[in-house]
Amino acid sequence: MSDDLFSKALENPDQDLNVELPKDDVDLGLLGDGGNERKTDEPAADAERSTGLGSGSSESESDSGSDSDSDSGSSGSEDDSADQDVEGEDEGGDAIENEDEDEDPSPSGPILSKNEILEETVPELPEDYEISEKTIITPIGVLKSAFENNIIIHATMSGEKRVLKEGSIFCLEDRTLIGMLTEVFGPLQNPFYRIKLPDSKKNLFDELKVRLGEKAFIVTPDAHWIDTFELKRNKGTDASNGYDEELPEEEQEFSDDEKEALFKKMKKQQQQRKKRDNRKLANDSDNVKVKRARQPKANSLPKLVPPLGMSSNAPMQHGYKSRNARENIKRESSATSNRNGSSPVPITQLHQQQFSANNYPFPQQPNGMPYPPYSPFPQPTNFQYPPPPFGQATPAQFSNTVPYGSLPPAYNNMSPPTQQSFMPMAQSQPPLPYGVPPMNQMQNPMYIQPPPQAPPQGNGNFQQVMELHQILLQQQQQQHQYQHQHQQDPRT
């Protein structure tokens, strides 16, 4: 743009050019004296520039040189003022820093943490403490080293079972007092004991330092022991955090950003997994509570009804009968017999089931052998022999041709029953169900089952039934007697 103005001025030197120069937005008041000088120079430069337009190119060149000189001078003045301001600010900042340093003086000595102890407390024995000749002392190790008022004793006894506890008293063989135990360290097989001496016992430390290698003893009454398994339970650490604890996870620092990101990701996953597990446990507990609430109460459950044969009030049926049911049946039968006024009925030894020790229904033979067993139901015809012993011939079968109501011919040769008892029905045992064996037969497997009793058909026919039963028993006795005689004499 400046080239166009100069070319126009050269072409028309007599013509005035109305040129609007750009305004400077910089606040010259902040620049100090240089700004004022620039303000005074600007009108003069404008006048010279307007007068120089009519005087040729040489004058314009001189004007441009003067303008450049003025601009350089003004810029130089501005730079000087800016440098002065920066130097002033630096001096002010240094002054503020000096004031801060004066307000917070640096602490004297080493920096200590909150729980750090600068000096170790030294346990001291009473001044009048002495080891008499009667006091029992026990060898424990040898003097290993001495440094900075510390005496190290290397134990010769194993500490796998127990070790000395702080506060135990050590001495030499001549009962020279060493001091109290301060620390135990080293392996359990041969631990080390450290004894800290106070500064007031410098002479004792020098004496013990000369006597290194001698045996060390403990005062047995003042020795304190601790079991090793208690030490193994509390595992130590070498961390140097507060209270000698390791840094928590949230305070750990990483030198690698990737490792830190991976650690945070794993920690986040663990937290999410833990929340998921807690939510699952809560849901399970809710389900259990709902299930328990839905369970019916004991009062609303239907009552169990015992089987018909096991109920105390049930009628007599085939099967097991409880004791109460049997007693009730017995009472009912006795009451009905008393009301009917029935006469005593003779009952043989077979019905009493008490006439022999071996519970056989028939009398013993002279040789002590019982009768052979027979079928539980009476067979009116075609009685068969039992299987004969090995090597004997089978006898021929015979049929029962004795008419009803008459006694067989061999009945006269039979011996009468040895004993009969007449007992009223009220005192007899109640009849068992049809086909059920008596209790002593259940208990004794060798018991021969008697013929089943026919169910009662009324009080009028009961005596006839009993007489018929007696006849059947006599016939069976005759049959068994004949079989027994035939087995003893097979030639007949």
UniProtKB/Swiss-Prot annotation:
- Note the InterPro entries from the entry: Gar1/Naf1_Cbf5-bd_sf, H/ACA_rnp_Gar1/Naf1, Naf1, Transl_B-barrel_sf
Where are the stretches annotated RNA-binding?
172-230
Bias (Acidic residues) occurs at: 60-70, 77-105, 243-259
Q: Does the keyword Ribonucleoprotein apply?
A: yes
Composition-biased stretches (Basic and acidic residues): 35-49, 279-289, 324-333
For this protein, what is any one GO molecular function term? RNA binding
Region annotation Disordered: where it falls in the sequence? 1-117, 237-346, 424-492
What is its subcellular localisation? Answer: Nucleus
Q: What is its main location?
A: nucleus
Q: Which positions carry Phosphoserine?
A: 255
Q: Which GO terms describe its cellular component?
A: nucleus; sno(s)RNA-containing ribonucleoprotein complex
**Compositional bias of kind Basic residues:** 264-278
What UniProt keywords apply to this chain's record, in alphabetical order? Nucleus, Phosphoprotein, Ribonucleoprotein, Ribosome biogenesis, RNA-binding, rRNA processing
Composition bias, Polar residues: 334-346
Question: Which domain of life, per UniProt?
Answer: Eukaryota
What family is this protein classified in? Belongs to the NAF1 family.
What's the subunit arrangement here?
Answer: During assembly of the complex, component of the small nucleolar ribonucleoprotein particles containing H/ACA-type snoRNAs (H/ACA snoRNPs) which contains CBF5, NAF1, NHP2 and NOP10 proteins. Interacts with SHQ1. Interacts directly with CBF5. Interacts with hyperphosphorylated C-terminal domain (CTD) of RNA polymerase II large subunit (RPB1).
Domain notes from UniProt = The central region (136-221) reveals a striking structural homology with the core domain of GAR1.
Q: What is this protein called?
A: H/ACA ribonucleoprotein complex non-core subunit NAF1
Q: Which organism is it from?
A: Saccharomyces cerevisiae (strain YJM789) (Baker's yeast)
